[in-house]
Structure formats: C-alpha cells, structure tokens
Swiss-Prot record:
This is Large ribosomal subunit protein bL20. CDD domains: Ribosomal_L20. InterPro entries: Ribosomal_bL20, RIBOSOMAL_L20_CS, Ribosomal_protein_bL20_C. GO terms for molecular function: rRNA binding; structural constituent of ribosome. Disulfide bonds: none annotated. Keywords: Ribonucleoprotein, Ribosomal protein, RNA-binding, rRNA-binding. GO terms for cellular component: ribonucleoprotein complex; ribosome.
Length: 121
C-alpha cells in the first residue's frame, strides 16, 4: 500500500486559516497557530454578536419610539398598551421607521392609539 503524505491537505487547511485571518495585526495574520486561535475567537464573537444584534436593534427601536411618542404626550409603555387595546398590530421596527420617515402617518397612529385609552388617565 502506498504511503499517505498529508502535505497537500495540511497546506490547504493552513491556507484556509490564513485567508480567514487576512487583515489581522501582527503574527495573527501569518503564524498558523496564532492565526488559528484568532480566527476561532473571531468566529465566536461573530456567533455571539449575531444574537446580540437582535437585542440591540430592538432596544434602538424602543428608544426611538419612546422619543417620538413623547412628542405626542405619551410614554412608550402607555403607547404600546394603547396599541394593543386599539387592535393595531404593527411591530416596533415598522413603527420606528414610520416615526422617522413618515411623521404625519405616525401621528395618525398615535392619535388612533390615544383614542383607545380611557379618558380618566
């Protein structure tokens, strides 16, 4: 049986790692062992932050909505409650975009939601 030499496969693996480490600083970009660790850590950060991105954007939409709704004399929590009571099912992302790009339409949504709130409050 012929002897199997692993030069081709290991070279391909090393090339793959170094390609992924392109743009890194210092020995992280050209030393296999260090580059491998750096790439692995980078992939861990990427995985973690893909999850965190969803939380971050939701928080951003809520901040924007809170600011926009306060201009109309409501707080964010009362606005969301009013939306639920009036049966308006629009997500926070869409409401945030509406508040930024279509202020008149957003004002109409706020007024519709306000009408669902009890007058005593």
């Amino acid at each position: 049986m012929a002897r199997v030499k692993r030069g081709v496969t290991s070279h391909a693996k090393h090339k793959k790692v170094l390609k992924a480490a392109k743009g890194y600083y210092g020995r992280r970009k050209n030393t296999i062992r260090i580059a491998k660790q750096a790439v692995e850590k980078g992939l861990q950060y990427a995985y973690r932050d893909r999850k965190n991105k969803k939380r971050t954007f939701r928080a951003l939409w809520i901040q924007r909505l809170n600011a926009a709704v306060r201009e109309h004399g409501l707080t964010y929590s009362r606005f969301i409650n009013a939306l639920a009571q009036s049966g308006i099912e629009v997500d926070r992302k869409a409401l945030s975009e509406l508040a930024i790009h279509e202020p008149a339409a957003f004002a109409a949504v706020v007024e519709k939601a306000k009408s669902a709130l009890p007058k005593a409050a």
